[in-house]
Amino acid sequence: MRRWHTVSKNRQLKEAKVAEIKEKMEKAECIVLADYQGLTVEEATELRKKMREEGVEYKVFKNTLSILAAKELGYEGITDLFQGPISIAFGYEDPTAPARILNDFAKDHKKLELKGGMVQGEVYDEDKIKALAAIPPRDVLIAKLLGSFKAPVSNFAYLINAIKEKKESEEA
């Protein structure tokens, strides 16, 4: 009787963990998987800090539970990536942030290896994740866009002012 209670309790804990993973996967704009084997505790702590600063959640779950959650959501394509020690970065606001942070960190820490991920339901392999990492953050893109709108208006205003000054000098 005592053994049955323990098994039931373990099952409840696992079901709760699968539900938690599913919720994070559903909520995330971008999910990036990385093999973290070989990172020191200090390196892992540094990576987690960088993730937090960018609003990215960085977690390690049992692969079997992550696979169950992915399958329940219909994310079959991502399940093959869960091999070995895998960490998951969940990007909720900026879909490029998890890829960018992990890619930059992997450049200096060769033991961290990008595996792939998922962006808005589409599976990305390692190369696509690296391409995503090259895209500037959302704020930078918006600033560039606004700057490109501002430049023609500024040039036009400069042109109008030059015409006005030319006419004034001709009248004088």
UniProtKB/Swiss-Prot annotation:
This is Large ribosomal subunit protein uL10. Keywords: Ribonucleoprotein, Ribosomal protein, RNA-binding, rRNA-binding. Part of the ribosomal stalk of the 50S ribosomal subunit. The N-terminus interacts with L11 and the large rRNA to form the base of the stalk. The C-terminus forms an elongated spine to which L12 dimers bind in a sequential fashion forming a multimeric L10(L12)X complex. It comes from Clostridium tetani (strain Massachusetts / E88). CDD domains: Ribosomal_L10 (cd05797). Gene3D superfamilies: 3.30.70.1730, 6.10.250.290. The keyword Membrane does not apply. It comes from the Bacteria. One of its GO terms (biological process) is translation. Belongs to the universal ribosomal protein uL10 family.
